[in-house]
Every structure is written in C-alpha cells, then in structure tokens.
C-alpha cells in the first residue's frame, strides 16, 4: 500500500543514529500534533529537500564519532537552511561536522545529572528554570563548540551540555530530552518544534482517517480484501478502517483457536460484526489446535505449532473468497522501523498471516503502517470501537498457550481463563486498569498442599503477573494495594476449581521477561 499523502502536514524528521530512544523522539513530536518520521541517517540532502520538513532531529547513538565505522550524515544537510536539533551523539556529530572538537570524557555520565542554563533567553530554554535535572548517557563530550556557536548549558562533568548557533537555527543537547527523566525535556522539544522550527500542530487523527479511506478506495478499486483477525487491537482497528473504506469488499477471517481469554471470541464478534457490520468469517478451530498441541511442553514448539496451524486454517478459508486481490495486515510503524527496510511488499512472518503459499498472489495493504500503538488506540476510538476492546491488555499471539507452562489441556485453560477473568474484573473495580501496563494470570504447572473445609487438597497454584512500564522494554512489578490482592486471591481460591494457592510475581524486567514462555 502506498503511503498516504502527507504533503499538507508540517513535518519534523528524526535521523536514526542507533539510539534506543529513537522511536520515543518520533512519538514525542507526534504527541505535539506534528507529524514525524524516523529516517535512516544515510538520507541525502536532496531526499530531505523533497520531504520539506520544518525541522530535523539527529538522534543519539551508541557509537563515538571517532569510531572507524561511526554513523555519518550528508554534510549538505547543514546547507539546507532547515533547523536542526542534535541529541547526545547527534550533538557530537554536529560538532565534528561543523569544525568543533569532541573528546573522550574523563568521567562518563550515565543517569541523572544537574545542568545550569547559561543563556536563559535562548528559544530552547526561555521560561524554563535555570537549574534542571536531565538524563545523561555518554562517554564522549564536546570540548570546543564550532564557530558561530554559543554554550547554552553545562553540568558538573559536562561543561558544554547544550549549544546553539541561533543564526542558522542549529541547536544541540548532550542529554536525552526525549525521556521523562529529563524534567523539562518535553518542554525543550516543544520549544524546538514550535518556536525554532515554526511547525504547526496540524497532524490530527480525523485527517488521517479521511486520507486513509481515500487512499484505500483508490488502490483497491472494486477488488476484494482479506484480513486475518486475531482478536487483538491492531487487527480489529485495521478491520474497522478497511470496512469504513470499502464495506463488503472486506472479508475478515477470525481463526478461533480456543486460546483466547474468557468470552474474548464473542466480544470480538459482537464489536466488529454485530456492532459495526464488518463481514467476518469465524472459524472454530479449537479441536484442531488442541489435537496438534497434545503432549507438547516445549514453549518454542508450542509457538511453531500454533503459528503453522493458524496459517493453514487461514489459507483454507482464504481460498474460498473469490476475486480477493489484497491481503491486509495490522503492521504498525514500529514494525516498519524495526525491519530497517521498506516492508510494503513483504508479508510479516508472524503467526497471523505469515508463511502464505507462493501460489496465493496478493498485494499487501497495511493501513496502519504509519501509526504507533498509542495512535492506533486513538484511531480505534475515533472509528467507534468499544473502549474496552481498544484499550485491552497486550496479548501474545499464541494466546494462553504460553501462560500455561508445560502441556496444554482443556482443564488448565479453564483454570487460567477463570482466574484471569477475576483478576481483570477486580483490577477494573479498583480503578487500576489504566495505571498498570499489563496484568494476567499464569499457570506455572505446580501443585501444592492446602486445606479447604475439613479436608486436605493437592491442587494448582496460579501466579499473578502485573507490571508497570512505558514501552514494554523494561518493566517493574506493579505495587497493587494489598487489600486488592487479598480480594483477588480470596475470589480465585473460592471460585476457581482446583486452585488452592495464589502467588504474586515481584520480579522486574530484566532479569525476567513479562511473559513466562
């Protein structure tokens, strides 16, 4: 699917030099209502001119500018007359390219640091406190600014923590303004975007919907489109947007593998088919999946079986649809970034629709490929999807198969479903559902001795996993109030048969992962 026309939106582009925060910079700019894209550092000045951005941000990165394979930038970009903000490595690269000096720091700075703003009237710091806490992560530093630059701020270990050439509108910060640990970082980014670049906040979801609908209609014409529905947010929003654009030309195939949460299959059908009129074919493949998974305990084998079987079921149904020329996917902008290449003609190799046979010739259509996850949720609500569906918990592709440790049985799935439903209900009752990144129940496969009534029991223990996070890359266990945990525990052992013990996982990520398998 061709990109929608974004020529009417003001844009700020972010050049990728390998920082773990690259996507975060792009998201921050979009949060201001300004369209932003993450582009490779190899982009040429001519290519930048065609994009016509209001500003450019050089991201951070793990390299030194003096490394043999240091990531570089086209020097002609500095001659375009476009404002530039360098962050961390981006500041050092700007310094080196423009004639300043970068040296190895005598003492590296990692973590919180205090800076003192020396030029309070600079557009980057105007109206902000002169002393600020920022987040540093660097082993090199600028020791001499290029000609025409002035020092804007300094820290104890970094005399040049920020600099600028106001005439050319080149600005730089050694700290990571994009992370929340920098207390005024977002204000600095906002000042660069609006005050320095003069960008307008004209990136709206309503405009995106209109442009997407027009683009889909133009590309699809009278052809039919098929889409695999997993029950998750991305595929549900994709289905809703496509339905708005082409109506009955879309057929969504919902493979019900029997591994979803309690009532989830029915909720998806109610929201999309009954609520919005999306044409969905529901395939009951529970027995087929359970038969293939019988006796399997290795988590990777479980994943592969589920992925392969999903594709086979999807293929069988797809062949029944006449005149289908397009295959739709819920690819997000994060997928595009992580692939490192243009994926417009590549089918994602995940369990939903990956691995299609070569004789099934489809053109790929990815209406969400320019959106981040949080933007997809906003889009879903704009399109009329229920709030609970749009904001539902992240859920792994293999479903409950990787929350049941070891062999999967109907009995174990029932235990996890029922216990998880109680957890979700009580978290919602306590008003905690949007302050916890992810929460679920897993069945670790252990039994323990207990006493219920006057008798001894030897039943399963279930484990509650609840974490707080910003992006899922790192996570801390959620500090759920004890009275809420107690209520959840009491309900589970009383209402879920064959459970006599409830455990709470207090491990962070790292060293643990969020899921168990």
From Swiss-Prot:
Q: List the disulfide bonds.
A: none
The protein's job, in short, is: Catalyzes the synthesis of GMP from XMP.
Pathway given in the UniProt record: Purine metabolism; GMP biosynthesis; GMP from XMP (L-Gln route): step 1/1
Q: Which residues form the active site?
A: 88, 176, 178
Name the UniProt record assigns to this protein = GMP synthase [glutamine-hydrolyzing]
Binding of ATP occurs at: 230-236
How is the quaternary structure described?
A: Homodimer.
Q: Which catalysed reactions does the entry list for this protein?
A: XMP + L-glutamine + ATP + H2O = GMP + L-glutamate + AMP + diphosphate + 2 H(+)
- The EC designation for this entry is 6.3.5.2
Pfam families xrefs: GATase, GMP_synt_C, NAD_synthase
Q: Under which main EC class is this enzyme filed?
A: ligase
| InterPro entries listed in its UniProt record | Class_I_gatase-like, GATASE, GMP_synth_C, GMP_synth_GATase, GMP_synthase, GMPS_ATP_PPase_dom, NAD/GMP_synthase, Rossmann-like_a/b/a_fold
* Gene assigned in the entry: guaA
The segment(s) forming the GMPS ATP-PPase domain are 203-392
Q: Which CDD domains match?
A: GATase1_GMP_Synthase, GMP_synthase_C
Q: Name one GO molecular function term.
A: ATP binding
* NCBIfam families in the cross-refs: guaA_Cterm, guaA_Nterm, PRK00074.1
* Keywords, alphabetical: ATP-binding, Glutamine amidotransferase, GMP biosynthesis, Ligase, Nucleotide-binding, Purine biosynthesis
Q: Which stretches make up the Glutamine amidotransferase type-1 domain? A: 11-202
Q: What does UniProt give as GO cellular component?
A: cytosol
